[in-house]
Structures are given as structure tokens and as C-alpha cells.
A protein has these predicted regions:
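Conserved ABC transporter NBD signature motif
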Residues: 75-83, 95
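Short catalytic/signature loops enriched in Gly
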Residues: 2-7, 20-27, 32, 249-329
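Conserved ABC ATPase signature
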Residues: 161-165, 169
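Helix-to-loop junction immediately C-terminal to a conserved catalytic motif
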Residues: 67
Length: 329
């Protein structure tokens, strides 16, 4: 059992339900969609938890709900021991300075009308105006220069605008902005997926260096298993708003338990033909859609510890396993 002091973020039974559709006069076409189905996980201090899954599985919704950009339908989000779902707006603003987000697309996440200086100093200015983190102009200027050095950006860039930079430079600017308030936890939403492969490695290495230097914790989400493997200490596998498996990186890749995890790992491209994995689940199969509606519900299939630090849900376990066996024959 881990000491609570070693846990910076703890999510318990988090549910996020959205209502979609439209009303027009007497015609109503609305339905509820569960984007998150009672997920639970922990992020340890100075460590990285990778959250992996296909597009649309609920990864980004998880981060936005943790940040309270979407208020959760139910469940708890403990950050440094405080339940964020019960905080007032003022208390939430104070808490958010220790938890910041790096967004997926550096092209759209930076205001094109602001200079780099204005973008990076904006969090400092806002928290100064709200008297949460008072700073003089000189202190703000000093902090901006520190952030430029930390993220490998030249000070000569400060008076320029986002459109003048490459994707990699823009993401460095986004990281500098996220670090402005000296947070303890970064939520990284597909932080390198929009970048060229050559630039991707540079940003990942920068994040690793910053984690060591600043004692940061990361919740790192991606659909790319290779990237998650490189960055993470532990990995959680998500499917349709449900976490199916959590394990340390080495264990997850060497001994995956849930059939969905197995098929994700099998989907990683392999150069050596002798190592090519043949057992996969066709996720668009009609039978999978059917069993998703008739299977054991996520609420009745919590994560269970099958070995030390290795947790697996029974949700869709037997059904997906039968598809694996079917595809093998």
C-alpha cells in the first residue's frame, strides 16, 4: 500500500456524462453519453503515468475533467489530498496554479495576437491581479527569462508572434507557459502528436529533463504506445471511457493481461517478420459493438490487483478474449 504522501493525484470513480442532440418545438432528440465510466487511478510524485487508448476513448475528457474545465457528473479528484470537486472558484483557482496543461496542437493553443512574452507572462499577470501569487514587473520579467532558458528558447523571440515559429518551437512556448506558475503536475494532452517525428524526440527529451530538474509529475496521454512506453513509469489502458488495465511499463509490455491491451501491443509495427504478432481484435467487428451493449457493466467490473502493482478489469475481458481466439483460428 502506497503512502498517501507519495500520491499527487488520485482519481476515484470518475464519471462524466454529456447530453447530446437538439430540441426543436415538440421534437426532442437528446440522449446521454457516458464519456467516462467510473475510472480510478493515481499519479505518483515525480513520476509519469501514461494514459493510452484509441482516439475517442475519453483520454482528453479525463484531463479536462481533472482540470474542472468540465465539471464531473460524479466521483472524486484528489490533488495533494484536496477533493477538487468540492472547492470554491477561488480555491480552485489557487489549486490550479500547481496543476497545468500542455495542449495537443501548438498551432491553435497559442493566441496569434499575442507576443511570446505576453503568452508566457499571462498566467503570472492573472495570478498577480487576483492576489494569489503577487509579483512585481521585475519579478515577472525575471521569471519569463528563466522559462525561456529552461525550454531552450532564445530571449530574442520574446517580441515575436506564434506564426513566426515552427511546430516544435511553439510547443516549447506552450510548455514554458505551463511552467510559469511553477506547477507540481503537468497534464500533457497528446503533447507531441502534432509534431514531425524528428522534432517529437526533442520535445520528449525536454520533458524528461524538466521532470528531473523541477521534480515534476506527469499525466501523459497519447494514442502512440511507443511514445507512452518511452515516457511513462506506469501505463493505464483506456477503452470507451473505461480503464481496463494499469501496470508498470515493463510489466505491461512483457505480460499484458487484458485482451484489449494485448491487441494494442500487437498493433505496434514490427520490422522483423518473425516477431510480427498475428493475434489481434478487429475493433470494428459488429460482434464487438453488440457485446459492448450486453456485457458486464464498468461499475460491476472494477480494477483488481492480479500481481503487485498490476491491475486488470474484467470488463469485456471474456468477450474480447473470445474474439482473439476466433481471429487466431
Amino acid at each position: 500500500m502506497k503512502n498517501e504522501k507519495d500520491i499527487i493525484l488520485k482519481v476515484e470513480n470518475l464519471v462524466q456524462t454529456f447530453t447530446i442532440g437538439e430540441d426543436f418545438l415538440f421534437w426532442k432528440n437528446k440522449r446521454k453519453v457516458n464519456a467516462l465510466n467510473g475510472i480510478s487511478f493515481e499519479v505518483e510524485r515525480n513520476k509519469t503515468l501514461g494514459l493510452v487508448g484509441e482516439s475517442g476513448c475519453g483520454k482528453s475528457t479525463t484531463l479536462r475533467t481533472i482540470m474542472q474545465l468540465h465539471r464531473p457528473t460524479s466521483g472524486s479528484i484528489y490533488f495533494n489530498g484536496k477533493d477538487m470537486t468540492k472547492l470554491s472558484k477561488r480555491e480552485l483557482l489557487k489549486t490550479r496554479k500547481d496543476m497545468q496543461m500542455v495542449f495537443q496542437d501548438p498551432h491553435t493553443s497559442l493566441n496569434p495576437r499575442m507576443t511570446i512574452r505576453e503568452i508566457i507572462e499571462e498566467p503570472l499577470v492573472i495570478y498577480n491581479e487576483n492576489k494569489i501569487l503577487p509579483k512585481t514587473k521585475q519579478e515577472i520579467e525575471k521569471r519569463v527569462n528563466e522559462l525561456m532558458n529552461l525550454t531552450g528558447l532564445a530571449k530574442s523571440m520574446l517580441s515575436r508572434y506564434p506564426h513566426e515559429f515552427s511546430g516544435g518551437q511553439r510547443q516549447r512556448i506552450g510548455i514554458a507557459r505551463a511552467l510559469a506558475l511553477n506547477p507540481k503536475l503537468l497534464l500533457l494532452d497528446e503533447a507531441v502528436s502534432a509534431l514531425d517525428v524528428s522534432i517529437r524526440a526533442q520535445i520528449l527529451n525536454l520533458l524528461k529533463d524538466l521532470q528531473k530538474e523541477l521534480s515534476l509529475s506527469y499525466l501523459f496521454i497519447s494514442h502512440d504506445l511507443a511514445v507512452v512506453k518511452y515516457m511513462s513509469d506506469k501505463i493505464a489502458v483506456m477503452y470507451m471511457g473505461v480503464i481496463l488495465e494499469i501496470a508498470p511499463r515493463e510489466i505491461l509490455f512483457s505480460n499484458p493481461k487484458h485482451p484489449y491491451t494485448k491487441t494494442l501491443i500487437a498493433s505496434i509495427p514490427e520490422i522483423d517478420p518473425e516477431k510480427i504478432k498475428t493475434k489481434t481484435i478487429k475493433l470494428d467487428e459488429p460482434s464487438l459493438t453488440t457485446i459492448r451493449n450486453t456485457s458486464l457493466t464498468p461499475e460491476n467490473a472494477p480494477l483488481e490487483e492480479v500481481e503487485k502493482d498490476h491491475f486488470v478489469s474484467k470488463y469485456l475481458f471474456d468477450e474480447m478474449n473470445s474474439l482473439l481466439n476466433k481471429n487466431e483460428t
